[in-house]
Amino acid sequence: MSRQHAYSREELLATARGELFSHSNARLPNDPMLMFDRITEIYADGGSHGKGIVNAELDIRPDLWFFGCHFLGDPVMPGCLGLDAMWQLTGFFLTWSGATPGYGRALGCGEVKFTGQVLPNAKLVRYEVEMTKIINRTLVIGQANARMLVDNREIYFAKDLRVGMFNNTESF
């Protein structure tokens, strides 16, 4: 199977509509919850565990929706949105790699550390996700470590992010 190794915002939004991957019903969130503008690289065999990598970027602009409400007079990107982007990318990796069809759901993470913040004057957020484990049985689970950088400075780190692919989410 031939796969792309980078994706534009338009292609990511096609994933939100269920149009990019014909083999799966997994989707990314649509705007405004899609937390990256492009995937700059995705490979099945990268990273220190040899399980794959996915890197993405978000262009920061002062008019991004979250700056207007979090917080009034003290605008900052909510930390949970950066963490959610890491789960989004982990789920995208599973779908891209051909995991069985399913609906992606965040299952948790082992450790999260915030050491900085994203302010409206920042220019670029970069996400680097390294897959550490993929279980492909009845339930597909991906596990990853990730970091988030703002203007080339690491400010978030997450270890053992877990995403599951469910055939049915009614009892989840």
From Swiss-Prot:
Top-level lineage group: Bacteria
Cellular localization per UniProt: Cytoplasm
Annotated TM spans: none
Active site residues of this protein: 70
GO molecular function: (3R)-hydroxyacyl-[acyl-carrier-protein] dehydratase activity; trans-2-decenoyl-acyl-carrier-protein isomerase activity
Name assigned to this protein: 3-hydroxydecanoyl-[acyl-carrier-protein] dehydratase
Gene, per the UniProt record: fabA
Metabolic or biological pathway: Lipid metabolism; fatty acid biosynthesis
EC number from the UniProt entry: 4.2.1.59, 5.3.3.14
Record Pfam families: FabA
